């Protein structure tokens, strides 16, 4: 009995396709998830009732499997039914497990993604329903979308109706004359002369929500509607309107000063344009524009930030200008301080006394030497290290340290040169003592290669190039030279004369380079008198030269040279000349000229004690 009833129910379900129908309804509910499921299912069933026989087109995968299983279970009645079973025409699919079936029930694919391939895979479908089924699926989805839009419009109309329920008073609002701005002007009375005064102390929540329920909305219709509304919908609409009001009034109302004048509604309508005009002031400031005019800010009553911000910019500019002026004064002081201290540091006092020399120069020689060596002296390294304008005191301190290091290097170089000169002079002194004996072999070797007659004397106009400074006296000073080429020694042997007569000395200032132009007089060493003239085109500077000073010209040894000089001078005069040579010389900077004295013409002066044999060649 139970089996017969069960078979009858099964046949009824198969005949009316109840199983696939419920499967499809569950699939629709899961995929669409409507807010109101019962009206959604009613609408879905109405669409099925309008088009009978098409339920098999939108079967889900699980419904198709269930239909196949039920058809196999009831295979005995397959031949007795005459209607078509299209889900059995297609070959069987592999059966799914219960977990796969549950997953397919929970998250099935979209209906259009299943229906279109199934229509393609069934070429034997009825020709009357095949084209209509595809169009019906598309139309069905269009209808569903339209229903969604209709629901959204319905919700919007409800929210508008709620706000309109409080506008039953004809004085409250006129939607034709004024545009509706949610959160700003809804429910505002026209007698309110200062509509923004109350909004300064609280966010601009629509007054229809606060005041309308208590004082304005006393009509029974409005109160009845408000009572029928659910609290959830009212809370949602209120929150939404609060958010809109805060967004709309953030720029124009939050930063308004308390003492703002009353604004008419015409001015408020023009306020948006004024905001548009003043919107790009911040952009202009970011681009570096400083002279912004504040005349246009009177159109915007709610932009108080524009009043204070340019003032802050102006004070910053003034402060930066003052800082620049103070920085200039500080750097000027730092420039003056190194210039004050550099001349004291730059003049080196290098005492170079000979161990055995006790005599000093005469007063005139000392004055001339001092005027040449230290009289015209400038700071040596002032051109190398200059303070940069606008630098910090740390930079000036570094510049002073650099000057000290350069000064110490120059002193080291001078000390090296002076040590070499001292060595050479010590050797010369020993050789001079040996050559003082009359039987010394060096005296006979000196005169033939050194001295020429006046017939072989070169004249400046006849020489192909100016005479280089590597002459006799410049070799004895121990200075490094520019050009080590040998030049002819312009000396002459003069006739015998009175031994007490003095040769004329040139009237040139005494420098370390020109000291040897002074005449060497012989007192008590025979009746011969030799005057050495020196030719030079320009003076010799010790900077930028070769490291090892060339003390003697090629082909001439210092022993021979000073042996000849020692034979004509007394010991005291010889040491006096050496002491004059040992005076410190000037070290010019790289930027200065390498000439200490103005270039003069080469002079060769030859004097004798006899006026008849006097010869002067220019």
UniProtKB/Swiss-Prot annotation:
Pfam families on file: DUF5586
Compositionally skewed regions (Basic and acidic residues) per UniProt: 74-84, 333-343
Polar residues compositional bias, start-end: 485-516, 609-618
Lineage top rank: taxon: Eukaryota
InterPro entries listed in its UniProt record: DUF5586
Biased composition (Low complexity): 463-481
Region described as Disordered: 70-118, 330-352, 456-552, 587-618
Signal peptide (from-to): none
Protein name per UniProt: Uncharacterized protein C8orf34 homolog
Organism: Danio rerio (Zebrafish)
């Amino acid at each position: 009995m139970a089996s017969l009833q069960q078979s009858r129910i099964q046949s009824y379900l198969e005949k009316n396709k109840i199983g696939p129908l419920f499967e499809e309804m569950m699939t629709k509910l899961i995929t669409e998830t409507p807010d109101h499921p019962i009206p959604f299912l009613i609408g879905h069933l109405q669409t099925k009732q309008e088009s009978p026989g098409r339920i098999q087109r939108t079967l889900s995968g699980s419904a198709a499997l269930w239909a196949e299983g039920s058809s196999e279970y009831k295979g005995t009645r397959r031949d007795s039914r005459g209607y078509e079973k299209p889900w059995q025409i297609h070959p069987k699919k592999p059966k799914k497990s219960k977990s796969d079936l549950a997953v397919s029930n929970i998250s099935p694919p979209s209906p259009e993604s299943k229906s279109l391939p199934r229509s393609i895979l069934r070429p034997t479908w009825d020709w009357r329903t095949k084209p209509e089924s595809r169009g019906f699926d598309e139309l069905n989805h269009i209808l569903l979308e339209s229903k969604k839009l209709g629901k959204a419009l319905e919700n919007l109309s409800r929210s508008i109706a709620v706000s309109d329920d409080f506008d039953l008073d004809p004085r409250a609002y006129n939607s034709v004359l004024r545009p509706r701005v949610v959160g700003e002007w809804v429910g505002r009375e026209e007698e309110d002369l200062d509509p923004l005064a109350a909004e300064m102390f609280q966010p601009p929540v629509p007054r229809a929500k606060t005041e309308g329920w208590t004082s304005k909305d006393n009509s029974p219709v409005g109160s009845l509607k408000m009572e029928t509304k659910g609290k959830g919908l009212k809370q949602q609409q209120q929150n939404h309107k609060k958010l809109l009001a805060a967004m709309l009034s953030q720029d124009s109302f939050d930063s308004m000063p308390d003492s703002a004048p009353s604004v008419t509604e015409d001015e408020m309508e023009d306020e948006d344009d004024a905001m548009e005009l003043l919107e790009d002031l911040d952009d202009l400031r970011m681009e570096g524009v400083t002279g912004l005019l504040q005349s246009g800010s009177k159109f915007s009553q709610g932009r108080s930030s524009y009043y204070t911000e340019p003032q802050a910019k102006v004070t910053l500019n003034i402060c930066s200008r003052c800082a620049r002026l103070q920085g200039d004064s500080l750097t000027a002081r730092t420039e003056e301080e190194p210039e004050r201290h550099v001349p004291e540091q730059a003049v080196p006092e290098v005492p170079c006394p000979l161990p055995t020399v006790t005599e000093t120069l005469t007063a005139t020689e000392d004055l001339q030497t001092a005027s040449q060596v230290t009289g015209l002296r400038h700071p040596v390294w002032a051109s190398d290290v200059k303070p940069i304008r606008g630098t910090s005191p740390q930079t000036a301190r570094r510049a002073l340290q650099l000057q000290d290091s350069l000064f110490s290097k120059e002193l080291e170089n001078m000390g090296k040169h002076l040590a070499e000169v001292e060595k050479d002079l010590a050797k010369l002194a020993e050789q001079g003592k040996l050559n003082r004996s009359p039987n010394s072999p060096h005296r006979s070797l000196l005169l033939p290669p050194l001295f020429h007659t006046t017939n072989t004397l070169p004249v400046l106009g006849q020489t192909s190039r100016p005479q280089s400074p590597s002459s006799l006296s410049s070799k004895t000073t121990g200075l490094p030279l520019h050009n080590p080429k040998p030049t002819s020694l312009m000396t002459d042997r003069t006739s015998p004369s009175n031994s007490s007569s003095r040769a004329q000395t040139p009237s040139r200032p005494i420098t370390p380079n020109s000291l040897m132009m002074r005449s060497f007089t012989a007192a008590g060493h025979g009746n011969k008198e030799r005057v050495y003239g020196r030719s030079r085109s320009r003076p010799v500077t010790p900077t930028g030269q070769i490291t090892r000073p060339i003390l003697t010209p090629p082909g001439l040894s210092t022993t021979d040279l000073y042996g000849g000089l020692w034979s004509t001078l007394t010991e005291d005069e010889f040491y006096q000349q050496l002491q004059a040579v040992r005076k410190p010389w000037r070290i010019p900077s790289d930027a200065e000229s390498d000439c200490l004295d103005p270039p003069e013409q080469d002079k060769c002066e030859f004097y004798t004690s006899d006026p008849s044999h006097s010869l002067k060649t220019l």
